[in-house]
Amino acid sequence: MEDGVAGPRLGEVAEAVEARAPRRVTLRPFAPFSAAAEGDGGGGGDWSFIDCEMEEVDLQDLPSATIACHLDPRVFVDGLCRAKFESLFRTYDKDTTFQYFKSFKRVRINFSNPLSAADARLRLHKTEFLGKEMKLYFAQTLHIGSSHLAPPNPDKQFLISPPASPPVGWKQVEDATPVINYDLLYAISKLGPGEKYELHAATDTTPSVVVHVCESDQENEEEEEEMERMKRPKPKIIQTRRPEYTPIHLS
């Protein structure tokens, strides 16, 4: 790397992409900063504090997939338009795979290596496809070390009762006192059917706000049924006459 060179230059990134470097990509400065550095006599200017080793980026840390946005809806339903869309990216990597998300109107393009993804991103970003300006963004890379979930931390797995083998520094947890709002209970106890409750007292400019607690419909219906039951006349039971007894020998 030349003296005074310390940031990424877009043109040289494209050259590095075309060269298909096997392991690492070296980022160089943007043109405005490199020109300023050359004007200072090659001393680096404001970029002299950057270590050249920090400019080397491992390819494993670069994304190998891009997300295509602002696409024509025909890409998701028309097979011919879809084949034309895929051919744009297969020129950079023949092993490219595609994932279509119709509801999000986006397509994920998976490349076999990060260099192909960077090459397609540089050349196809903001290009016109089917009358719309297509935009490409790098997909976020995820590095999962293990396919299993990590166990939870053991600091909150103990109950209030002491465990069989308490760890060092473990202490008994005391039950918290229940919180009781006595003001609310007192206000509720004062309420009753048919009584009023003044929420806000009246002032010189505002009226008072009073709440009248009404009886429930079920209680009213029960009272009406009880009143009707009391008003009904009691049924009179008529006693039947006992049949006269006639001896058998007289019949």
UniProtKB/Swiss-Prot annotation:
**Biased-composition ranges for Acidic residues?**
216-227
The record's CDD domains line, in alphabetical order, gives: RRM_RCAN1
The UniProt entry, under InterPro entries, shows: Calcipressin, Nucleotide-bd_a/b_plait_sf, RBD_domain_sf, RCAN1_RRM
Name of the protein: Calcipressin-1
Q: From the UniProt entry, list the residue stretches annotated as the region Disordered.
A: 216-251
Subunit info here reads: Interacts with RAF1 and PPP3R1. Interacts with PPP3CA.
Q: In which tissues does this protein get expressed? A: Highly expressed in heart and skeletal muscle. Also expressed in all other tissues.
Q: Name the GO terms of the biological process aspect.
A: calcineurin-NFAT signaling cascade; locomotion involved in locomotory behavior; negative regulation of calcineurin-NFAT signaling cascade; negative regulation of smooth muscle cell differentiation; response to estrogen; response to ischemia; response to mechanical stimulus; response to oxidative stress
For this protein, the record's SUPFAM superfamilies field holds: RNA-binding domain, RBD (SSF54928)
The record describes its post-translational modification as: Phosphorylation increases its ability to inhibit calcineurin and decreases protein half-life.
Which key words are in the record?
A: Phosphoprotein
* Functional summary from the UniProt entry: Inhibits calcineurin-dependent transcriptional responses by binding to the catalytic domain of calcineurin A. Could play a role during central nervous system development.
Instruction: List modified residues, type Phosphoserine.
Output: 161, 165, 216
Tell me which GO cellular component terms the UniProt record holds: cytoplasm; nucleus
Tell me the organism's taxonomic lineage. Eukaryota, Metazoa, Chordata, Craniata, Vertebrata
**Record's Pfam families?**
Calcipressin (PF04847)
Any single GO molecular-function term of the entry would be: nucleic acid binding
